[in-house]
């Protein structure tokens, strides 16, 4: 399963979906996040979070054995195509920069995506949670 920044932040910020997202992560055989998605989450908590939330980010990834995946040339090509097909201002999915890396990782590995919102549900990727 591929973890999108939106789901990771929902957990860290204890939003409504946090418990369902944490359960999906716990139940998954493997969970990965693009290094670009990790950086996006880290920038958010560094800018908006307190010391506790900053520490929670890395602790959460460690506790749930979430793997940071490097960006490959293949993923860059897939991310570029994702923006052309589903990007902000181009398609209702409105994928942003970070979303395109999540899309590319999920597409390359053929894995479902755990995300918050409706952006990825308007693409050709499989959601990790239906709804």
Regions found by a protein language model. Give the residues of each.
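Acidic, PIN/NYN-like endoribonuclease modules and their adjacent C-terminal/linker elements
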Residues: 103-131
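Helix-adjacent hinge/juxtasegments
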Residues: 55, 59, 63-64, 69
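Short, well-structured N-terminal submotif of metal-dependent ribonuclease cores
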Residues: 1-33, 46-59, 131
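Anion (oxyanion) recognition and catalysis
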Residues: 25, 62, 107
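General small-molecule cofactor/ligand-binding pocket signal
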Residues: 32, 67-69, 128
């Amino acid at each position: 399963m591929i973890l999108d920044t939106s789901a990771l932040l929902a957990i860290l910020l204890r939003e409504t979906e946090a418990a369902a997202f944490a359960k999906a992560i716990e139940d998954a055989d493997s969970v990965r996040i693009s290094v670009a998605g990790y950086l996006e989450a880290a920038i958010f908590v560094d800018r908006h979070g307190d010391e506790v939330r900053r520490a929670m980010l890395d602790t959460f990834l460690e506790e749930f054995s979430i793997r940071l995946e490097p960006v490959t040339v293949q993923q860059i090509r897939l991310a570029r195509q994702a923006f052309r097909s589903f990007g902000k201002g181009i398609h209702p999915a409105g994928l942003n920069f970070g979303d395109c890396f999540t899309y590319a990782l999920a597409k390359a590995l053929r894995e479902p995506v755990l995300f918050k919102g409706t952006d990825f549900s308007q693409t050709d990727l499989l959601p990790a949670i239906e709804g």
